[in-house]
Every structure is written in structure tokens, then in C-alpha cells.
């Protein structure tokens, strides 16, 4: 079925699915709290993935275990911190700040002065967010989004190592279990209390886990089989804009003009770095 759909549309659908799941999860923060929501998503996602994949870990080496555990720590931190950020700042702003993680990681590997312009553009976006009304009134949320950005950068690095060290998606399945364990001490109580009061929350967060984890992974995997990674990277750069749109439609979170300009700066810088990086790798 997915072979009939253009690959770029699959990649865009994956991003829309992720941000829609996040927006839906935020609508239930009053019942389970932000960390409780992250915990429910991770628990359901980890259990489903573990049951489907059934990772064969018996003969793993110490290096394979280390890589998978470190990936899980990064994944757990990324999910918990970004949900904490969602609780106090708009989703569009939080995802824009979080997106600085992979952007800075890309810039750290550059050796060309031309790419400095993209760093300056991204810095302009950071400054605009830093002096905007959201940053002034919700310092904790901004700090949580920055922590999520750091975890996202770590997730990218460790995901590459896990992919190289462990065949298939067995490493990802175990990493999801580790991420779940990371969240349990902080969100188990509020998650259980919310579910006891309203058992239908299990269905809601099963949908969130599907939208935020299972479906995007399947769509991205199908897209990457039929498109070059340069185009995929450019499309991924639209994440902050899609997050802002999801926040507006689902949560009525309107961004200020200053925040929209900041979002545009970070998105443009990410696209520029992606295109520049792919061109460099194409040169013999």
C-alpha cells in the first residue's frame, strides 16, 4: 500500500503523526501530569515493541549492551524532558528549541566557513526565543526543552552506534525498555493515579504511542527506502513548523510574531546545514 504513496508524503505523514500525538498527550496533562503522560507513552510503546520484535539479547557482547542502554537513556531523557517542556510552553516553541540538538550536532561536524552563516541564523533564532515572552515567563519549560535537545543529540549519536552494532531493530526494542525504566521513578505514581480515576486513558495513550512511536517509525522506514537522505533531512527540518501547527489546531496555542520568526530561522538553518552537508559528502 505505501509503495503507491510518494516517499516525501510518507516522511511528512510521519512528522505530522509525531506532533499530533504530542498535542493529544498534552490535552491529558491535567489527569496524569506531563511526566505521567511521558511514562504512559513509553510503557505502552516499549511493551508493544518488545512483544512484536522479541529482541534476542542472550548472546550480545558488552559493547552491544552498552550501546543499547545508552541509547535508551537518551531516548528516555528526550521524551521526559520534552513533555515537561510542553507543560509550560507551546509545543511549537518547545520543539524549535529541541531541534537545536541535532542542528548543533550537524554544525559541530562542519569544517567550512560557509556553514558559519547557518550557525549565525540558528543563533538568531535562539536569541529571539531567549528574549521572547515565553522564555521570560516559563524558564523551567525552556530549560527542559534545552535538556531534551541535548538528549536528542545523544540519541542520534547512539542510534548510529546501535544500528552498526546490532542487526535489525532488536537494539531499538531494548532501548525502548530502558527508556521506559528511566521514566518510571518520576511518572509512575501520577500515571497510575490517572488511570485508576479514568481507565480510558489507557486507550488514549495507546493511541499516542501509536502516533508518536509505532506509526512514524514504519512510515519513515518505508520513505527512506525510496528517497535520498538529503531530501529526507530537509523534510525533517520542517518539524518545528509542523509542531507549531499541531499546537495551534489541537491546543489553540498561537505563537507570537517573534516566536514565528525564531522558528523560521532555526528551520532555515537546519535546511541549509542539511543541503550543505549532503553536497560535501557528494564530492569525491
Which role does the model predict for each range below?
Residues 40, 95-97, 158-180, 213-249:
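Helix-helix packing/entry segments at the starts of transmembrane helices
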Residues 3-8, 31-35, 39, 60-65, ...:
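Juxtamembrane helix-entry segments on the extracytoplasmic side of multipass membrane proteins
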Residues 17, 50-94, 126-128, 209-227:
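Specific transmembrane alpha-helical segments of multi-pass solute transporters/efflux pumps
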Residues 36-47, 75, 83-113, 148, ...:
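Specific alpha-helical transmembrane segments that line the substrate/conduction pathway
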Residues 49, 105-106, 133-191, 205, ...:
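Transmembrane alpha-helical segments that form core, pore/gating elements
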Residues 100, 114-133, 246-248, 258-277:
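Hydrophobic transmembrane alpha-helices of multi-pass small-molecule transport proteins
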Residues 1-36, 73, 77-81, 124, ...:
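Glycine-/small-residue-enriched transmembrane alpha-helix faces in small-molecule transporters
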Residues 16-32, 44, 79-89, 97, ...:
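Juxtamembrane C-cap of transmembrane helices in multi-pass membrane transport proteins
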Amino acid at each position: 500500500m505505501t509503495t503507491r504513496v510518494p516517499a516525501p508524503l510518507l516522511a511528512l505523514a510521519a512528522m505530522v503523526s509525531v506532533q499530533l500525538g504530542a498535542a493529544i498527550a498534552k490535552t491529558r496533562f491535567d489527569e496524569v501530569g506531563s511526566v505521567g503522560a511521558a511514562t504512559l507513552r513509553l510503557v505502552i510503546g516499549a511493551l508493544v515493541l518488545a512483544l512484536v520484535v522479541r529482541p534476542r539479547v542472550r548472546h550480545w557482547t558488552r559493547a552491544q549492551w552498552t550501546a543499547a542502554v545508552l541509547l535508551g537513556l537518551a531516548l528516555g531523557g528526550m521524551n521526559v524532558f520534552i513533555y515537561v517542556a510542553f507543560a509550560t510552553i507551546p509545543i511549537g516553541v518547545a520543539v524549535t528549541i529541541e531541534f537545536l540538538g541535532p542542528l548543533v550536532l550537524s554544525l559541530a561536524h562542519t569544517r567550512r566557513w560557509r556553514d558559519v552563516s547557518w550557525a549565525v541564523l540558528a543563533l538568531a533564532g535562539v536569541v529571539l526565543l531567549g528574549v521572547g515572552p515565553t522564555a521570560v515567563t516559563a524558564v523551567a519549560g525552556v530549560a527542559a526543552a534545552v535538556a531534551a535537545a541535548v538528549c536528542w543529540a545523544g540519541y542520534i549519536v547512539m542510534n548510529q552506534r546501535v544500528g552498526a552494532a546490532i542487526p535489525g531493530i532488536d537494539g531499538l526494542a531494548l532501548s525502548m525498555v530502558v527508556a521506559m525504566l528511566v521514566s518510571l521513578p518520576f511518572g509512575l505514581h501520577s500515571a497510575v493515579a490517572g488511570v485508576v480515576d479514568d481507565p480510558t486513558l489507557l486507550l488514549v495513550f495507546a493511541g499516542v504511542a501509536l502516533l508518536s512511536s509505532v506509526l512514524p517509525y514504519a512510515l519513515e522506514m518505508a520513505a527512506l527506502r525510496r528517497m535520498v537522505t538529503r531530501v529526507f533531512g530537509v523534510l525533517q527540518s520542517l518539524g518545528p513548523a509542523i509542531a507549531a501547527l499541531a499546537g495551534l489546531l489541537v491546543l489553540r496555542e498561537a505563537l507570537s510574531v517573534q516566536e514565528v520568526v525564531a522558528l523560521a530561522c532555526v528551520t532555515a538553518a537546519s535546511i541549509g546545514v542539511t543541503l550543505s552537508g549532503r553536497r560535501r559528502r557528494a564530492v569525491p
